[in-house]
């Protein structure tokens, strides 16, 4: 199967260059699809600066014209936001629009709607609009997303193409993502859509990265100190292959099976926290009071 994967060495080099400067000051609030947890959306608005803060909605991943206006309406009606702008980027050429770029650069909260994550990357990566989001995030803006708007946030992004009934090498199509959620590969709808096969396949081939599977109705709140907290109704799964012995064997009908010994998996619930730098579970906020 053809894999549209940028060289991993390029991704790691880019991450190293980014890491050489000051780390981003922004937070991430990333939802795994399904219903958007009220607590997660309120946290997004709070981190943006409150209901009066400028918020930009990017419906780029969606094929529906209603997605952007509906998300704007939710921010206004449910969370009292008064300065919400839909930035309707659908084509790459629109990412060069000066008005759109100015709106994104001035936003304190930027929210990516769901749909097809490949559309976000095609339209925005390496453009003035994409750069404006990155600059705003580095300066302290909160970036949020749901479903595809979550999947696009890691340095490598699962596109959704592949045979997910097996755990095999070279089986999952990856693209370079936006790279705001560093050190991981994030996968939404994780428990609801039984996506463990594809995330395990990817992490066994990229043990330097953590797999973070975010279930529906659930979010991760990623902080500038490289920790995250679980918000919502279900689970967040962390897959860690740093100490795993990876094995390979021929697969029936071609291909290559991939296996691992001592693969570490954490199943986290609401309120539990994780340190991405040390790859360890932290006490829940309620346990430290």
Predicted segment positions?
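A short, aliphatic-rich alpha-helical micro-motif
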Residues: 104-105, 137
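Glycine/threonine-rich flexible loop motifs
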Residues: 117-127
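Positively charged n-region of N-terminal signal peptides that target proteins for export
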Residues: 1-4
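Catalytic nucleophile loop
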Residues: 112-114, 133-157
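ATP/NTP phosphate-donor binding region
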Residues: 45, 53-103
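Bacterial N-terminal signal peptides
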Residues: 7-16
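C-terminal and late-domain segments of enzyme folds
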Residues: 21-51, 62-69, 75-79, 157-159, ...
């Amino acid at each position: 199967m053809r894999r549209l994967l940028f060289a991993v060495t390029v991704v790691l080099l880019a991450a190293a260059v980014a890491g050489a400067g000051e780390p981003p000051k922004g937070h991430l609030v990333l939802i795994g699809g399904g219903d958007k947890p009220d607590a997660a959306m309120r946290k997004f608005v709070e981190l943006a600066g409150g209901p009066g803060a400028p918020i930009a909605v990017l419906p780029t991943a969606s094929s529906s014209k209603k997605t952007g206006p509906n998300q704007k309406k939710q921010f206004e009606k449910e969370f009292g936001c008064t300065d919400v702008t839909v930035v309707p980027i659908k084509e790459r050429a629109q990412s060069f629009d000066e008005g759109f770029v100015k709106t994104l650069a001035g936003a304190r909260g930027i929210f990516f709607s769901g749909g097809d994550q490949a559309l976000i990357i095609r339209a925005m990566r390496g453009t003035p609009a994409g750069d404006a989001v990155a600059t705003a995030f580095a300066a302290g803006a909160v970036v949020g997303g749901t479903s595809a708007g979550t999947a696009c946030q890691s340095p490598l992004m699962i596109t959704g193409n592949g045979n997910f009934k097996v755990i095999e090498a070279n089986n999952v199509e990856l693209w370079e993502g936006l790279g705001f959620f560093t050190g991981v590969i994030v996968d939404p709808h994780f428990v609801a859509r039984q996506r463990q096969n594809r995330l395990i396949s990817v992490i066994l081939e990229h043990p330097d990265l953590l797999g973070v599977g975010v279930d529906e109705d659930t979010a991760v709140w990623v902080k500038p100190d490289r920790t995250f907290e679980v918000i919502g109704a279900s689970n967040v799964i962390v897959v860690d292959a740093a100490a795993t012995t990876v094995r390979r064997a021929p697969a029936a009908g071609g291909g290559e099976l991939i296996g691992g010994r001592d693969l570490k998996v954490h199943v986290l619930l609401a309120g539990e926290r994780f340190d991405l730098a040390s790859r360890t579970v932290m006490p829940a906020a309620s346990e430290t009071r």
